[in-house]
């Protein structure tokens, strides 16, 4: 058990035993740190944990107080997308959300989106209100504004958070949204390939036409990015698949790879729309007799947890689903800092990171 956990449990014991009374003002953070013999940073983290769990209230300019006994019990509803598609990010961030809720003493229920969409609005609103939820995690994204569940959630008048959203989600829904800086993340992945010495990079993107923005860029902008990084910039280096059409996706990705490798100047690396596309590139490369990374480097995007178990482990731009899940739980526990905030900010960025793994060869010293 680490020092922060020790402090949290000891202060919680003092509160539950009544030694620290509801409404009682505690010493400041520095004094508490000295009393417990821990660093000030450790105490700050412990106090934040207690605030998130509702044990204490921190009022800036006034101090730290033991929460009143009538403090609202936190209870969240997870609304799942209702599909078994392994590419849905919610599947990978929800375990971290649930773990954090458990640590913070939050009760969690789950509902399937299909159920909500086929239930009468008035009755569903009444039922959800009767359950006294204090927050909703809407584990779906890409709203067009016509979804029947939206008026249900709005009538509840409680915080709704999308833990992995599209750029337009907050504007369309009015809900809080966690997301990556997708444009910067995509650029950073390409920059990493350049740093590894790659001058010819093929892109396998998901899209149905050349006008759609993919990872924040049009096709022409993707070509400009290749040129900006000193890479071969030609439309022959870009292939499109539609990952939403799962039927035959494996064969379509293989055809994309064959098209790229048939070029007069075939790519040294493939930068994939997602880690799931990268998985199919692995399979196609194996059937084509290409070794990764000796013959072809492969880079993914998203941070699918299973990528590290591929052979070789998949290099990727990790959108950090773990951080998204934990942050979502903490934000729903502390809505005062965003839901009730008058500045109107609804979009919150989860930092990405480059996972440097063996699927990308390093052709020069970095």
Predicted regions and their residues:
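Amphipathic helical "hinge" segments at domain boundaries
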Residues: 29, 68-135
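Minor-groove-contacting beta-hairpin "wing" of winged helix-turn-helix DNA-binding domains
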Residues: 27-28, 57, 62-68
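Flexible loop/hinge segments that line or gate small-molecule binding clefts
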Residues: 141-185, 276, 302-314
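Short acidic capping loops at alpha-helix termini that bridge into adjacent secondary structure
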Residues: 22-23, 199-200, 233-237, 292-297
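Periplasmic-binding protein-like
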Residues: 77-78, 132-141, 161, 202-206, ...
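Extreme N-terminal segment that seeds HTH/winged-HTH DNA-binding domains in transcriptional regulators
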Residues: 1-38, 48, 89, 125-130, ...
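Flexible loop/turn connectors
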Residues: 10, 14, 175, 250, ...
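Hinge/beta->alpha junction and helix N-cap segments in small-molecule ligand-binding domains
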Residues: 81-92, 110-121, 142, 177-188, ...
